[in-house]
């Protein structure tokens, strides 16, 4: 498991990523890496026993990271009130089924959003996962938290 957070309010422009400033639980095995001050997480697609035997597990094409994200979001001051949304993205491409949408009635009216999604990372590759503002207006994100776990691994990392 690896956990990252950002409690202070941050303004995230359309198309940009949420920045995570605190490492709550680091990944000690190198499967999840984050550059300090970045919203991008490099996930490694290591699959156990992928080249050892002819069992069904060797045919698994992806490493699955259970990715849980939660935060409070609001329309930023000075922006037009409109529906706002954030979503998980792999290598900059939004995962549509992870989109979290709210419709505030006023600026700075916070809503809690969350998603818990299985994110496939290609075997033996590394891919970048982030949380992106998919709205058409700047938003404020506060108390952001993201957790990555690998259910297929029976050891703690």
Where are these regions (language model features)?
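Extracellular jelly-roll beta-sandwich "head" domains, especially the C-terminal globular C1q domain
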Residues: 1-157
């Amino acid at each position: 498991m690896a956990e990252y957070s950002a409690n202070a309010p941050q303004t995230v422009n359309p198309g940009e990523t949420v920045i995570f400033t605190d490492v709550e639980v680091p990944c000690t095995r190198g499967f999840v890496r984050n550059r300090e001050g970045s919203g991008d997480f490099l996930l490694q697609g290591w699959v156990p026993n992928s080249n050892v035997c002819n069992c069904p597990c060797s045919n698994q094409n992806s490493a699955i990271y259970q990715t849980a994200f939660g935060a409070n979001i609001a329309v930023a001051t000075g922006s037009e009130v409109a529906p706002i949304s954030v979503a998980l993205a792999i290598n900059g491409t939004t995962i549509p089924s992870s989109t979290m949408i709210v419709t505030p009635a006023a600026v700075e009216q916070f809503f809690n959003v969350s998603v818990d999604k299985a994110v496939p990372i290609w075997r033996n590759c590394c891919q970048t996962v982030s949380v992106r503002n998919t709205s058409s207006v700047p938003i404020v994100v506060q108390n952001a938290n993201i957790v990555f776990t690998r259910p297929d691994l029976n050891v703690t990392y």
